[in-house]
Amino acid sequence: MAPRLQLEKAAWRWTETVPPEAVTQEHIEAAYRVGLEPCQRGTCRRNCRGNPNCLVGIGEHVWLGEIDENSFHNIDDPNCERRKKNAFVGLTNLGATCYVNTFLQMWFLNLELRQALYLCSSNEHAAGESIPKDKDYEPQTICEHLQYLFALLQNSKRRYIDPSGFVKALGLDTGQQQDAQEFSKLFMSLLEDTLSKQKNPDVRNIVQKQFCGEYAYVTVCNQCGRESKLVSKFYELELNIQGHKQLTDCITEFLKEEKLEGDNRYFCETCQSKQNATRKIRLLSLPCTLNLQLMRFVFDRQTGHKKKLNTYIGFSELLDMEPFMEQKNGVYVYELSAVLIHRGVSAYSGHYIAHVKDPQTGEWYKFNDEDIEKMEGKKLQLGIEEDLAEPSKSQTRKPKCGKGTHCSRNAYMLVYRLQTREKSLTVEVPAFLQELVERDNCKFEEWCNEMAEMRKQSVARGKIKHEEVKELYQRLPAEAGSPYDFISLEWLQKWLDESTPPKPIDNTACLCSHGKLHPDKICIMKRISEYVADFFYRRYGGGPRLNVKALCKDCVVERCRILRLKNQLNEDYKTVTNLLKITVKGSEGFWVGKASLRSWRQLALEQLNEQDEDAEHSNGKLNGNAPNKDEVNEEKREEEEELNFNEDIVCPHGDLCISENERRVVSKEAWKKLKQYFPKAPEFPSNKECCSQCKILEREGEENEALHKMMASEQKTSLQNLFHDKCRPCLGSWPQETDELYIVSQFFVEEWRKFVRRPTRCSPVSSLGNSALLCPHGGLMFTYASMTKEDSKLIALIWPSEWERIQKLFVVDHVIKITRTRAAGEPESALYSSEPQLCPECRGGLLCQQQRDLREYTQATIYIHKVVDNKKVMKDAAPELNVSSSEAEEEREENKPEGEQDPDFNQSNGGAKRQKLSHQSYISYQKQGIRRSTRHRKVRGEKALLVSANQTLKELKIQIMHAFSVAPFDQNLLIDGKILSDDTATLGSLGIIPESVILLKADEPIADYAAMDDVMQVCMPEEGFKGTGLLGH
């Protein structure tokens, strides 16, 4: 199919030969492209928007041919949630509870512990009793929760189960990751305490039998040799891994002898005095299950937070503990049964998984929340986990492991089981628990059946829709000579899109002002058969229907008229162009603006297009909606502001303008052609006189310019040093030749200099207003000291001789004078007084207001300058960063053309006459002066931050972290040589004001850059398991 623009031209080509009054139904159908050939499938890469008969590429390809049944629904196969044969059951991660899931799976595979828990009886139900069917079972104690969880893990049909009841009973925060080793200790203590109330000794003592061992702290006095023992129980051995490579090295260090000397000497009861001694740990007995905690998470003294040690530790599958025991004649060979892994390089984030051996088959499994993976063969495989946790390329390479040994930098707990030749236990689920499991299995089966039925119904509906769409699409094209309807292409596409159910048909957006189909909307419409249209309107409703009667003859006739006028315009443009080449003699021509001549064709086209748009608005509606009054008024205003033909030579008084460069004479023939298109254009014969009022104003303007130039020259000559800012007096070093100096506003001096530089552009300065420097009581707002320092930029000092000239040239409202009085006999000492005198009350109020403004600000800019190691940080380094040549900057600004000046420096009032500063505007004026004089110029390695006075230093450090990638605990901040250390203090209380420059010195970055992700969590106080059931709350 031809491109869209070609189809547009072809649809209206008949207008070249057919006048508007001769338009027939055949022409109307041509305009609406009814007769275009429909496209065949395979001939179009995409739908032809210019052809309403093209029904290819509208989404039909999805429905033609065979369709996969899964596309008719978005329901996953419920059997994917079913437990596979001989597979273990996973546990849902509730947010950050993966550390809990790993321990639950490990304890579940401790068959002795599982059996003891099954035998545990509760207050409500003795072991062996059934639960009433009409009552939902809700575990009350920790033991009951574990019983129910273990029973589900053993016999559930689900692929994974939800441990939220157990987690909720402990009161754990599911969104906060906790210390897994601490959780293990606290839960074992809680479980032991809970089981101690059981009558059955096998249940009551199961924790001690499985996990409890004994060791003794043995202290030997070096003086008398007396040996003292302190026997203690342990449930795990906490082994330091720093500086070690093998597990046996860690155990050796744990049992290493320690010397007690100096201040740490031991008080010997035999010697009755402090003596040097040795202390060590002796292992007395070991449990059946030996838990070895590898201390991967340690406290970092430099940062004040925990960090993870990514040290590789080697360990074997068989561990002989006999060399470490006090008594050597026992059985102390242990087999590896579980390895608990922490993925990640930070102590505050990451993911926990567990590798646990099945005690019945000897096979290894990886437990990762809902997902459980069986290892190939019967060997433990840790290599993949170590690769996943690779923090950086700089880490130590993984050492080679021999047969039966492993090494890991992510293992934080190793569990060994005492080697035995006895067969493993066969643990059966008690009847009352099995009944609960069966109930849950029944619910799961019901859910699976519901999901399967929903899938089946969705597939059935999809197949019906498939056949329906195939049939309707075959009958969708309208055959030649048959009744037809136009329908929205967008609606058709939504009908073919299964993801969005179609809404009622809405054709209102395609209507013209006459309530029929707009010819320009044909590109978003499609012509379909009446049969399919009837089906659509019956099923989905909507409207209005757009059949053959909806083709708008009025719109087609009007478009025909406008197109013919545009064609005529092209011919007239050529004629006028040739006529303009003819020289006009005498007074037979007409004045036409040059700008109008350049754009008359475009203006005529726009005029024709406006007529086309007016036709759409003719009945007060556009696409069925009445236009907004505000929109109509806005359009009228825009039309008034637009240039109309020949108005570019009309002066403000409605007469011919005086500038002959903006107009030219055209012949009568050319003007007649132009007048056809612009009948209301102003007409000026070539003998027409220019506007007399404009001539008078022109002469007056020239006279004013000459007067202003003369004034500027006179004032510059009289006050030459003031204009050039040369030989100016200074209060800090009072000139010897005079005892009086006068003060004027610096604002006055700047405005006056602008006028002198550009007298034809700027208004003359006729008055000198000093009221801005005085308070409402008429007193001076500045002290002598302040005028030599911070307030010096607000005033200008004037010599007495200059003051005399100023009084002659300008109207002065207030005289401000400073007088020096020398003491008799002491020419070096002098007193300074001002007229008018200082107003202490208002001066104090001004200072308070200034300080308050500096301490109370929002969204102000400060600058952070990062200092590298090789640059010395001086106490006064911060002020140096603010140094900028403000005077040179101002001079450059003055020399710029108007409109290009920096608004921070340009204080002129847009060329208007200077207005006096009132007292109320004094403060804002002063702020402008301060801003101009202390304008900050950013330097390399510096970034601007938006801050408020009430935010804390800690919050500022977080902003700095995002800007410079420096963690808060690595930031050293200084301002004016003072270290900022109180994280809870506000910026206002620390003396940080707008435009301050803070120096940032970063400590050496930690090797683990991923820890940056945990800065927010690091900065929060660590509460551990406070408030949970593990601590008895």
Swiss-Prot record:
Localisation per UniProt entry: Cytoplasm; Nucleus
Which reaction does this enzyme catalyse, per its entry?
Thiol-dependent hydrolysis of ester, thioester, amide, peptide and isopeptide bonds formed by the C-terminal Gly of ubiquitin (a 76-residue protein attached to proteins as an intracellular targeting signal)
Q: Name all DUSP domain ranges.
A: 457-552, 567-690, 710-823
Domain USP, first and last residues per copy: 89-419
User: Which parts of this chain are annotated as the region Disordered?
Assistant: 610-639, 878-920
Ubiquitin-like domain: from which residue to which, for each copy? Answer: 931-1007
Annotated PROSITE patterns: DUSP (PS51283), UBIQUITIN_2 (PS50053), USP_2 (PS00973), USP_3 (PS50235)
Q: List GO molecular-function terms, semicolon-separated.
A: cysteine-type deubiquitinase activity; cysteine-type endopeptidase activity
Q: Which GO terms describe its biological process?
A: protein deubiquitination; proteolysis; regulation of protein stability
Q: Which residues form the active site?
A: 98, 351
Pfam families registered for this protein in UniProt:
DUSP, ubiquitin, UCH
Q: Which GO terms describe its cellular component?
A: cytosol; nucleus
Q: What keywords tag this UniProt record?
A: Cytoplasm, Hydrolase, Nucleus, Protease, Repeat, Thiol protease, Ubl conjugation pathway
Query: What is this enzyme's EC?
Result: 3.4.19.12
Among InterPro entries, the record links this protein to: DUSP-like_sf, Papain-like_cys_pep_sf, Pept_C19_DUSP, Peptidase_C19, Peptidase_C19_UCH, Ubiquitin-like_dom, Ubiquitin-like_domsf, Ubl_USP48
Q: Which PANTHER family match?
A: UBIQUITIN CARBOXYL-TERMINAL HYDROLASE, UBIQUITIN CARBOXYL-TERMINAL HYDROLASE 48
What's this protein's function?
Recognizes and hydrolyzes the peptide bond at the C-terminal Gly of ubiquitin. Involved in the processing of poly-ubiquitin precursors as well as that of ubiquitinated proteins.
* Similarity remark: Belongs to the peptidase C19 family.
State the protein's name.
Ubiquitin carboxyl-terminal hydrolase 48
The scientific name of the source species is: Gallus gallus (Chicken)
